[in-house]
Amino acid sequence: MSQSNSHGQSNLAKFAFNIYGTLSTNSSTPQSHEISPSSSLSSSRSKKQTSQYNTQDTNNNRLSYYCDKEIISLSQLNCSLSIGGYSGDLQHHVVIGGKNYLRLLCVSESQQRIISGINLLESKSIYNSRAPNKLINVNTIKTFADTIATGLSNGVVSIYKISPNGQSKVTGKYSDHNRTINSLDFIESENQLLSGSQDGTIKLWDLRSSSTKPVMTVQANLHSDPIRACQYSPHSAVRNKICVLSVHDSGALCKFDLRTKSGGKVYSPEKKWNLHTGPALSLHIHPEKELVVTGGRDKRISIFNYGERQSRNTPQNLINTYGPVVKVRWSTYTNTEETAEEFEENKQAKPNTLYNYDIACSYLNDDPTITIYNLGRKFIPKQIIHSKKPIQNFIWARNETRSRKIWTISKSSTFSSYNLDRLEDSDVSRPIEDLNNIAMTWDNNNDFCAVSQARYDYDLETYENGINETTEENFDAERNYSLGNEELIHSQANSLTASPVDKPQLTRSLTFNPASSFSTFSPVLVARAATGFLQNDSATSSSSIPNMQVSSSRPKLTRNTSQTTQDSSSSQFASVLPPPSASQTYSSPQYKKNNPPRFMNNPAYVIPVSIPIPANDEYVFRKLSSESLVSTPDGFTLVDVCLLNASVAASVGNNRTSQIWRLLAVSIQEEFESGIEPRRIYAFQPEAINKLPQDVQETSTNANDTLHAETTNSNFVESFKSTSTSGSQFGKQSDKDERKLQSKNSSGNLMDMINKANRTNSFSATSFKFKEQERKEDESQKAQSIKDENERASIHSKSAPISISSHPEDLDDENMGSNNSAALKFSPPSVGVSIPSTRIISSSLASSPKSVRGPSGVKSHISRSRPSPPVQTWLKQKNLEVSNGSAMASTSGLSLTLKRNKTNEEGDQLTKAWKFKSLLRKSLDYATLQGDIIFCSTAALLFYDIVPEIISQFECLEWLGIYIEVLQRKRLFVNAINVIKCATADIQEKLQKLYCQDLSLRFYCSNCQALLVNEKSKFSGKGEFGYWYCDECSKLQSQCVYCNEPCKGLAVTVGLKCGHHGHFGCLKEWFIEDQNTECPGGCGYQII
């Protein structure tokens, strides 16, 4: 029965391979000529193997494999295997482990497809297990030749042997650890194995022995300090010394010597260094030197020299990352195979081994990236791998082409391969390619520094081969490359009179002062090439400037605005530099003869600039950030908050900002608090004039036959209004109603101010038609029809339309057009303007100014003009609306004229330019251009939840993020926290993730600069434990400036400038009781 089952499985596998070979052209699946139909699978291979081949993804020639269970660990097996049916010799394979999962994937020579998969959990074993289906968790994997060692979560170490035909066998199981095994490593051969566990011990196993007990147990302390990683060092300078390094949860790096005589147990390391303030999670030893790289939860990567002759206790290099580092690894191969275009080198390895190898690291907290650094430029990642899912583990992969490949496994149970040498891979970014050569930043004192650095100016040390000579032909070629058609530059550079003035080299101890520079010729921008071509030797040129280094590997920095640099040492030799290179330095034979090879350090040009900008006043910024309201207190409205912010801005002299806040307050009151719907203005339709009723036109014409036709027809409403306001009780009552309406609603004041400012330009012959939408929709149908009929009756086809206002005072003011027309008799028809009745109008054509309420021409004009009954009915209706408080504010003819061109032919609705949303958007745009971060942030905090369509979430986060950074830089931490507290819920959640994280405080000794951990006295029980002393140098850290006693716990600092501090009680006695104003340390610092 078993034979028939195995025969059926074999036939199924043959059939599946035939399908994949004939139906698929994908390079990741086996082809028909690679696996024959008669190929067979081992019985240890999974029954689900054939179904998993379909999940292989080879987009962009990337190897990908999906696992059906959760995977945690990853390693590479480098041994020769012969898979049945495949003619090639497979050398590099993938080993993946996880929860009840352990599989060996055989990869092709090109590492672009998976040939076969072997389930190692079904391997033959010499150990008889009563629970074959027991759940295991493979936490770590280590390989050596044909041996695979796995560390399980239950503290068991399992050893697998792989035969050349792909068969696997369990050869050993060792269980002496009490907790999870975190790290494994072989010692020079497959017979000795190291295991580091969470129980704080490192055990050495002899795999040739039949005993299941460890040969040696190593422990860092008497108490258990969990071991995160351990590794054997093959670079020991002492013969036969077995050196092992380990990192612990305490952040310590320990060095052990396994040549012990203490009976196989070591309880203290040979050396110990505290490199991290939190748990150290990973380590990896350099492939060539006694250097180790460690990564920890403190977001730091430390490169430390653990050699015998070194005595320093601090890392040799530090890399600050953007997340907690869970794994860090040196690259397998050097960078000698990289292209010359990327590093501006001719495939020559750097002599410093630190720069030959890259460093890759992955992060905690579900970060989907892997960052690659190089110590040649450690502050900027060299490459970043972006994955769709969080990265679980990774390794540098060995391959036949010695290319830089990284294998990864993600939390989505997917194995992927990334080739860092392929430029077309979209998931691998190169941040250095996107950086600008010039950058600028501000400091705490409102000064800024500009940095100018070429892209490939690595911070490299000297080359061992010295400085190479350059022939005359190379100089000619370089001149042609850098100059091209610049004959003007070439001609001026070859004359002594036009040579540039020598400038001293920029150093970090001096401040660059552009005002003291000489006027020099600024050539056209070329690729940072020197322009000196003087071939004459001049002793005064180089000797006049002290400390001049003529052989700088980078051209001197000029003091003009051009980025082209000029070499001031042209009297010694002539050179033109191509784009800056880290591997070549051009010099003359004379210079090489007189100067030996020296260090080639290419620092960036840092230019500190101090400009007294009035807007950067410290007092103004502090007052505005502290007193401006960013939220609405209880009992206040938005209008009150805007007015208070306006007063704060006015108190520091920011008058424009103050006026903007007041304008926003008026617009808020008009739109949100007045309760009046906004007026809607529609474009005038000329054909509506021809459709007016004939009886309305005849009535209006007969009522005004005693005056000139044009004057009377255009101003008969104003004449009637003047009669009513001068002699009737109705006019007096309308004045009272108008004043009540104006006191109730302030929105009309804004319109009147606009009309007053533009009254002299409000006369126009353009026709307009008004359609007013009333606020109350429950009016009777009869009143509505009467109003519409009277509106149409007020328009004449042969004259300009009449601007009818709901304010009696405005109608009285518009009579000014009638007076002028009656006096001049030939003036053109006009449109009424809202002008206060107490004003005196002066016309440029009249002989003297005339009062609007003057009795002389007004009464005679009114006595000859009476409005028609339809007009009286319309006016009564409008005055009734005024008394009820439901009238609309009038709109001047100037506003309509300005908006006339903004309407389309369909008559779309227009929006007021002084609306709140429009004013807010314009104010924010202007403040953004001016760099007013306080106004932008304050407005975003106040109005983001009110008008989210005006202030986007991206803008709000950007403004508030910059504002918080500036506040923290200026040490205004209370204001920064207040900004976060006043933000809306969605914004506050994102800001807290960025700016409210836990602080990591590191204390260093002020004498020996060692990290204060004081582990020697921590468990001794002698005295009070703390960080006010140092175990390394046995010196006190801080003493009270008043009583000269140690400051244990809380200490008060006198001032940030002097730095003296002391006990709270001592300083209270000195300053408050004794009423002293100077620092008790004698530095002369005044606190008041």
UniProtKB/Swiss-Prot annotation:
Species of origin reads: Candida albicans (strain SC5314 / ATCC MYA-2876)
What does this gene product do? May be involved in a process influencing telomere capping.
Query: What GO terms are given for molecular function?
Result: zinc ion binding
Question: Can you tell me which residues the record assigns to a coiled coil?
Answer: none
Give me the ranges of the annotated region Disordered: 26-56, 537-597, 709-751, 764-829, 844-871
The terms describing its cellular component in GO are: cytosol; GATOR2 complex; vacuolar membrane
Q: Where are the zinc fingers (RING-type)?
A: 1040-1083
> Might you name a Gene Ontology BP term for this protein?
positive regulation of TORC1 signaling
Q: Which family does it belong to?
A: Belongs to the WD repeat RTC1 family.
Localization, per the record, is: Vacuole
GTP-binding as UniProt keyword: no
Gene3D superfamilies, A to Z: YVTN repeat-like/Quinoprotein amine dehydrogenase
Q: Which UniProt keywords apply?
A: Metal-binding, Repeat, Vacuole, WD repeat, Zinc, Zinc-finger
Is Metal-binding one of the keywords?
yes
Q: PANTHER family attached here?
A: GATOR COMPLEX PROTEIN WDR24 (PTHR46200:SF1)
UniProt cross-references to InterPro entries, sorted A to Z: WD40/YVTN_repeat-like_dom_sf (IPR015943), WD40_repeat_CS (IPR019775), WD40_repeat_dom_sf (IPR036322), WD40_rpt (IPR001680), WDR24 (IPR037590), WDR59_RTC1-like_RING_Znf (IPR049566), Znf_RING (IPR001841)
UniProt lists compositionally biased (Low complexity) regions at 27-44, 561-572
In Swiss-Prot or TrEMBL terms, this protein is called Restriction of telomere capping protein 1
Origin: domain of life: Eukaryota
